[in-house]
Amino acid sequence: MKSTVFFKKILSKSFALLVLTGNLATTSSAQILFFNNGAKIYTGTSAVIYINGGFQNDNSAATPNFFENNGTMTIATSGTPGSVFLTANSILQGNGTYLVEQNWTNDATFIAGNSTVNFNGTLQEYITSTTATITTFNNLVLAGTGFGNNRKKTLQLVDAKIGANGTLNLNDRELETLTQTLFVLNPSNTCVTNSTILGSEGFVSSNFNIGGSGSLSRVTNSILSYIFPTGSSVSGTRYRPVILTPASGSANTYTARLGYNDAVSDGFNTAALDTTMCIVNPIFYHEIKRSSGNDNADIEIFYNQTADGGWDGMAKWNSITPGIWNDMGAVTANVNIPLSSVLKVNWADFSNSPYILSRKKPPIPGLTCASVCPNSLGNTFSAVGTGSSYTWTSPAGTTITSGQNTSAVTIDWGAVSGPVSVTTSSPLGCASSAASCTVNPSSAVVTAFSSAPTGLKYDFTDISTGGANQWSWDFGDGSVSTLQNPSHTYAACGPQRICLTASKDNCVDTACSDIDVNELYIIPNIFTPDGDGINDIFFINNSCIKEYTLEIYNRWGMKIFESSSGGWDGRTKSGVEVSDGTYYYIFKAVSLLAGKDYNSKGFVSLVRKK
């Protein structure tokens, strides 16, 4: 039975516009406003068809019909849903544009050509089939203004494909695959695009559970980066994409999907970790597969640090150790706004799928325990590590006095033995395993020394016990030494306090002794004033002498020389050389020390070398 047809046809040089306001034919579905039952229809590139309701392409004949659209065809929702039904033995083909405001049911044949299908409805739209027929789109565009579930364009009970030259433009919509897969067969790395505006991202979502298969699949043939814009609208919109970068230009196929829930609910125990990690992401994880090809690939997983916390590692389930999350080794953590990422370069093992972000334990810090002295103060312990903070422990009977949270601490040690331990933590708060060493206090050092004077020169000897291996001498006049057995010559006489500090490791002891540096003078009995610079002067070496006079007499008792500031050079006061021979001297001195004066007399021989 046919109903009345109301339409208006407008022609111009550039296009024809057909507006349908009633049914062309009645069908079993009240949703259909345009029903083609076997007719061959062709529209040119300038044609515009607007259908205020559903469109069904059908054919009850054995020979397939075709509807070829090369123009723009709008299937709008107005009172009745604007859905597309391809049924029976029909063919829809052409290079035109389809603007679909509701569902797409393909039980027949769709030949995409260079066409574009734009799902732009304000309600949730479905791509489906009752005969498991997969639609291969050329360009697939998701648009519309709906919110919440009405953002979704959903694969229902059937997979879908993007052709070898096609594109996928998600805009700010959600492509919900549920348990199905969208296969992108175009190997161009730029054929998938989406909005990345925070809160309005376009993404592909999937049901994620044990054995689930919803995903986005992409073929690759270059070393460029391929985005997998995965996300979820469970409890709010969350965009958590993955970028894969193959190692070569060979053909590969990779798939990815996001599980926006704690992995433990899908059978992947987030408490089962190898020893290099302290926690894995309890909010989401990814499944990433290489379904064909052999290339390694860089894997970069993105997250929102504000919503998800910070992460600096990546882990994989079941490899190498079954039943736990295994750290994937060295990665690069990039902190940005709004999305941060963790990058694993040149990953090879695609044997097991689930991947998750992790917090890596820093390496165990290096720690060497110093020897300490019983009941000693200020013992220093240092660790070498890569963490940003350190936590120290020491046994009962000791006290950490400074340095907690840093790489070096000082500890006041009692008379106990026991372990010192330290862990280092990453900026994300993940602590390393502990480094530990046991401290057994050394024997105490008891300092002692002796001294042997020769005038102003003193020889000091260490006689400490306890195995001291370091010495610090203070000679009392501002001079010091670190020799074990030093000598020191004083510049003046008088009392001095000598102190020796002897130590072994942190066992330190100090002993002091007072000495009285006395004067000394030495009178030679011969000199040779022949101008060779050797023993040319008759000089009485002296110390601690306040003042003195030196008088020289010849054999007849005549004084030929006198001085209070120097020695005799073998000349008279007037500068005349005297002859070789034996001369008489008188040396009178006043000591710096009260009550001590000296008066020495004797003979000295003057011999000039021939």
PLM-predicted stretches and their roles:
Residues M1-N37, Y355-K360:
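Bacterial Sec-dependent N-terminal signal peptides
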Residues S28-A333, N346-S351, S358:
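Extracellular beta-sheet-rich ligand-binding/adhesion modules
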Residues G96, L456, G494, S579-Y585:
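A glycine-anchored, Pro-Gly-centered beta-turn/N-cap motif
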Residues N294, Q305-G309, V384-Y390, T465-N469, ...:
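Short proline/glycine-enriched turn/loop motifs at strand-loop junctions of beta-rich domains
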Residues P362-T391, T399-N525, G533-D536:
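Extracellular/lumenal mature domains of secreted and surface-exposed proteins
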Residues D514-K610:
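Short loop/turn motifs at secondary-structure boundaries
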